[in-house]
Amino acid sequence: MELNADFSQKVVVDTDSLEWQPSPMKGVDRRMLDRIGDEVARATTIVRYAPGSKFSAHSHGGGEEFIVLDGVFQDEHGDYPAGTYVRNPPTTSHTPGSDAGCTIFVKLWQFDTDDRTQFHKDMEAELGAPENGVATAILHRDMRETVTFSSL
C-alpha cells in the first residue's frame, strides 16, 4: 500500500474527515496519513485505543516515535499521559494498550538504523518562552535529526 508516499509533494490532510480503519487488533483503530508498505510499514498514523484494548507484543525494527494526544497510553515500560513524547528506536519491543483509552500520533520505520536513543518526556515542560506567539520545544536532537514541537 502507498498513501501520500511521494515526499516531494506537499500534502494537507483534514484528519477529522478520515474514516477510522480497524487494525488487526480489536479495539485499535487508525487514520492513515502516509504509508509505504502493508501491515509492517513506514507510516505516519493517528491511532485510537478503545478503553481496555491492547496490541500484541511486537518489536520495532525501524523504530517508533509517538505523541499521546489524549488519554493514557500504557506498556510494560510505563504510563504515558496526554502530552508525552515517546521515542522507541529500532530493536525495541513492547506490548502497548490503554486501560482508559487514548489517541496517539505515531511515526513508524523513520529512524536511522543505528539510533538506539530511547526515552520519553513531557512536551509542555520542554517549551521555551513564546516568540511571536509560538513556543517551541526541542524533543530530540542528534547528528541525524532534530525533532521539535511548537505550541500556538
What feature does the model see in each segment?
Residues M1-E39, V106-F149:
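A short, N-terminal "cap"/entry segment at the start of jelly-roll beta-barrel domains
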Residues A50-S53, H60-D75, L152:
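Glycine- and acidic-residue-biased ligand/ion/polar-headgroup-sensing regions
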Residues Q74-H94:
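Short acidic-glycine-tyrosine-enriched beta hairpin
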Residues R30-M32, T44-R48, E65, Y85-R87, ...:
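Conserved hydrophobic/aromatic beta-strand scaffold that supports enzyme active sites
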Residues E65, R87, A100-R116:
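A short hydrophobic beta-strand segment most commonly corresponding to one strand
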Residues T45-I46, F55-H60, H77-G78, P96-S98:
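Short histidine-centered beta-strand/loop micro-motifs
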